[in-house]
Amino acid sequence: MFKKFLWRDCVFIIVLITAIALPAYIHTNYPQAFSRFFYPVEAWFTKRDLRCSKNAPHFLRQLLIEMIDEQKSLNNQVAFWHNGQLFHCESGWEDGFRGEKPMRVNSRFRYASVTKVLTSALVLHAINEQKLSLDSKIIELLELPAPKDPRVAAITIKMLLEHSAGFDRLKTYMPMLTMDVKPWCPTNLAQLSKTKLDFDPETQFQYSNVGYCLLGAAIEKAYGRTFQSVAEDYFQLKKYGIAFVGDRFLPDEIQYDYRFESFYSEFYLKHFDFKDSLYAVGGLSGSAADIVQLLAALPKEAPLTIFSHNHTPCSINMLDACYGYALQPYQASGQSYTLWGKSGFFPGVNTDVFLDEQGNILATLRAASAKKTADTLLLRQYAYSLMNEYVNQK
């Protein structure tokens, strides 16, 4: 009897130690796997406390649920501008799951490449003021040496705006977002003259960060001031609470979730040159409400607006197949509604803005990396379907 008691006692102790030690070991050595495992539980709690402004359209809440369930982001903002009124919803916390700071309407996120919409708007404003031209040659504008690749001499402002200048980041190493490598743009612009293009200009659309860095340099040349100061004056950034990020997180910036990142965590910020190189590419921060209000207040300029585009045929029924001068148009097959958008991504954050020509503006900010890039495309299609339904039922 005593031996049986000892045996049972030993088994109990082993099971108890394993139950305590195994989770601790996994949490210590495989923190991402641990946090991924518990995500469904955290998501359930988060969805119990979605916060929306009065009379916010129901589709904003639907978007939040999609962002939590499918985009794997607990801490989110959505903002919608309609008929001169702002509506918004938030989920989660600024400081992580069950934190002390619930997500607010003015909580600060990095906008990532959504910044490019404002860069484009600034360039189009300069063109409307006749300080630049769509046909301005970037080599001539920046007073650079004759290029080794003669095709570089043909690059214009228009080509840079619509990502058709000849840069393909999937083919040629361009160190705009490469760890511990100082980009040559905008601090060593003469390197452009040594660059070999990946395709003949205006024969393809290929997304390019270096192209938008060059647009930032064009603004500085046109106005004789820093890009940041020109942007501050034209957009009145402080009025909207929008600020440029530097080489560290801002004091009021929210905490990002990297559990579905394969490599990066918050350390990434130390290895990229946000301060000197990325300000025109992905350098702005603010809330979803901030960006929709700023876009709604953009001056009504002519002849060019952020909806302007080249009339080269493209597949508007496919995401990322068409580029305007500031935004990407999308119209689902069989539909007549066109939604213009821009997406952004940094480790731990995904962003989108959507606009239509009726004045509706939607922004979605997620403080987490998606599980797969394809998931972010599904969100954009879902946003289109919700906006299409909402606008057409009015």
Swiss-Prot record:
Family matches, as InterPro entries: Beta-lactam-related, Beta-lactam/transpept-like, Beta-lactam_class-A_AS, Diverse_Enzym_Activities
Keyword flag Glycoprotein: no
Species per Swiss-Prot/TrEMBL record: Dichelobacter nodosus
A family per Pfam: Beta-lactamase
SUPFAM superfamilies: beta-lactamase/transpeptidase-like (SSF56601)
Superkingdom, taxonomy of origin: Bacteria
Annotated protein name in UniProt: Putative fimbrial assembly protein FimD, serogroup D
Keywords: Fimbrium biogenesis
Cell inner membrane is among the record's keywords: no
